[in-house]
Structure formats: C-alpha cells, structure tokens
Amino acid sequence: ARRDAMPQINKMMGIGSPGLVAGFPALSDEWRWRYLHYNNVAQTPAPRSSTLRVSRHANGYFHFGVTIDQVKEKADGLIFTTTKGRRLETDFIILGTGFDTDPHRQPVIEPYADNILQWRDRYTPPPGLEDEGLASFPYFNSDFSFKERNVGQTPWVERIHCFNYGSKMSLGNVSGDIPAISDGAAWLAREMAARFYSEDIEHHWQYLQDYDTPELRGGEWTPSDLPNSTLDGES
C-alpha cells in the first residue's frame, strides 16, 4: 500500500443514517465539499472482516509505504520490484487502484467531456480545502444525469444517467455502498419515472380526457329526501 499506515476509523460509517442519505444532496456545495474533503483526509479503512480474512493466513502480508516500481512477465507468472528494492514472484497481481471520476479520462464519454459540468466549474474551495480529486467529479442533476457546461451545446448529455461512484460528490454515497444502494436505486427509478411522465405529459393529458370507465353505474344508491332530525336522535 502507498499509505504509511492502515486507516482504522470509518468516519462516514459513524454518521450513516436515513437523514444523511436524504439530506446530503440538499446541502450546499460548501458543506458537501467539506464533508467529503474531511473524509478523504481521514481515509477509509478496509472492513474488519475482510482484513481478518487475509491476516489469518500465514502467507498474508501487509506492506505499507511502498509502491510497485517495475513488473516483468514470465512464463508462469510475474516478477515485480518495489520502490524499497524488494523482489517478488507471483502467479498474478490484483491492483486496487481506486476510481478516477474525471469525464476527460473516460474513453466512452471523452469526446464530449468538455461540455460536462464538473465541480471545479461550480465551486472554489477555501484555502486548505483544495482537492483535485473532488474538483474532477461531474456535477449531477438530481436524477444522476450529467449537466451541460454550456447549456444547449450538447443537451443529450443530460439523458445519460450515471449511477456509479461518479455521483458521490453531488448526491452522496448511494450508488455503490451497501447501506444505501437500495435507496439510491429506488431514487433513480423515481426520478426517471418522473422525467418520462413529464416528457409524455401531452399523452397523459389526452388519456385523462378520454378515460370514461364508470366507477359507479347508477344503481348503487336511491335518491331520497333528507329527513328532519334532532340531536337526541328523534325525527
């Protein structure tokens, strides 16, 4: 690991609640930035159970403050050296490199990424809270879709719903984290249903006017005069 030590406290777990899920997107840009910048600085540990599944093995090792310097392929595996001069031979390597949320670095959307609004376009943090990683996040609409940087230039980008880690900065950790992903999926479905309905409003308006299936058929009651009555029940 590049880190010098394993983080031990999951700060966001400590404040996890339905209020956070519902309330985070409603916070100001300043507060959302402050929350996630603080969490980035504190760093997030691996789950305890996952860590124990590795450490219980005699050949499970944790190396801190070191990165891979060179990798060479051989017939039956790989040879790599670290920045501390260690040489290791392995069958394979799994690289946990994290996420890159910058639209300009995503091949699928790179051709039109210049017109996708990012956090750096909407918010400038105060001194000491700068974070290039946070600044590169897309700035989303409430339905997980992109926003245009220059409105009207590529309006179709707002029809791309990005339900993944890229939505974290704008809408919270609801698209890839176990405690809230079900909330996020339901949220996305509601937002898309609302959007489809509003786009088809002329059709629904016509259907409203054309609907003529009676709820009552006329034989469910008999018209009558209202009898005189008093509060003691006598009539």
Predicted features, each with a name:
Residues 2-235:
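Flavin (primarily FAD) cofactor-binding/catalytic cores of flavoenzymes
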